[in-house]
Amino acid sequence: MMAKNKMKPKKALAKRIKISSTGKVKFGHAFRSHLAQNKSTKQKRQSKHGTFMHPTDYKRLKDLM
């Protein structure tokens, strides 16, 4: 009898998120790599820091991880 195959995590997603000790998902903001002169100071400042994903999006991540 054959063993079940393990589900592998999507490496693209695994490289972009971190799971905190409390189980929250942290990710970085997009639109920071170039063309910064066209973006407002507020947009650049607020995208410096990572943010936590909303819990309603966890269901989508579960299949990918």
Swiss-Prot record:
Pfam families: Ribosomal_L35p. It comes from the Bacteria. SUPFAM superfamilies: L35p-like. One of its GO terms (cellular component) is ribosome. Residues 56-65 have a biased composition (Basic and acidic residues). One of its GO terms (molecular function) is structural constituent of ribosome. GO terms for biological process: translation. Gene3D superfamilies: 4.10.410.60. Keywords: Ribonucleoprotein, Ribosomal protein. The keyword Flavoprotein does not apply. InterPro entries: Ribosomal_bL35, Ribosomal_bL35-like, Ribosomal_bL35_sf. The keyword Metal-binding does not apply. Residues 30-65 are annotated as: Disordered. Belongs to the bacterial ribosomal protein bL35 family. This is Large ribosomal subunit protein bL35.
